Amino acid sequence: MKILVTGFNPFGSEKINPALEAVKLLPSEINGAEVRWVEIPTVFYKSSEVLEAEILRYQPDAVLCIGQAGGRTGLTPERVAINQDDARIPDNEGNQPIDTPIRIDGASAYFSSLPIKAMVQAIKKQGLPAVVSNSAGTFVCNHLMYQALYLVDKKFPNMRAGFMHIPYMMEQVVNKPNTAGMSLCDIVRGIEVAIEAIVDYKDKDLQLVGGETH
């Protein structure tokens, strides 16, 4: 089994991105699966162009995209990506689409094809906080998740794909009072065991409570 893991470069006012720093430290084999990582630009459309090129080159069985969600307290596998860009800030090339469909011929939304609840359980068993997220936002993270699942729908039907947000690294919150952070070591370990779950749960997810009341 081959798994492609992606990590965004820094964006906004941040000098580092924990997603990229973490994926760089992943071992080349996890739970018997071959793992490769690729850096993704935090740029609408260019991000998915880089992803598709790497999919064509590597031919992975699964794609796990990783992104920073500053303020979140744990690792959060995303349930769904929506067909809408609505950028609060410009991307790294100054693009700021507002209320713009990502793909005219795509679905209104795509659900992750990764075992998100098994991933959450695996992370929590390591003593790390994790929960299913029901919104990937409307910035480049949601854009890339949507594009990955669009590619599954239109071009790579045997591939699985999904997205997981991670918190800030501790050094990013030194001057951000009351903002959660996590050590890079713990972030890497959380991603590793999430990948273990992706390998173990190829056909169906665990049936565990992961919903919200609001």
From Swiss-Prot:
Q: Which Gene3D superfamilies match?
A: Peptidase C15, pyroglutamyl peptidase I-like
Q: Name one GO cellular component term.
A: cytosol
| Known EC number | 3.4.19.3
Q: Where in the cell is it found?
A: Cytoplasm
Enumerate the catalysed reactions.
Release of an N-terminal pyroglutamyl group from a polypeptide, the second amino acid generally not being Pro
Keyword Protease among record annotations: yes
Q: Which InterPro entries match?
A: Peptidase_C15, Peptidase_C15-like, Peptidase_C15-like_sf, PGP-I_bact-type, PGPEP1_Cys_AS, PGPEP1_Glu_AS
* Record has Cytoplasm as a keyword: yes
| Domain of life the protein comes from | Bacteria
One Gene Ontology MF term:
pyroglutamyl-peptidase activity
| Record's keyword terms, sorted | Cytoplasm, Hydrolase, Protease, Thiol protease
What GO terms in the biological process aspect are recorded for it? proteolysis
Q: Catalytic center at which residues?
A: 78, 141, 165
- Family, per entry: Belongs to the peptidase C15 family.
Q: How does it assemble?
A: Homotetramer.
HAMAP family for the chain: Pyrrolid_peptidase
- Explain the purpose of this protein: Removes 5-oxoproline from various penultimate amino acid residues except L-proline.
Name by which UniProt lists this protein: Pyrrolidone-carboxylate peptidase
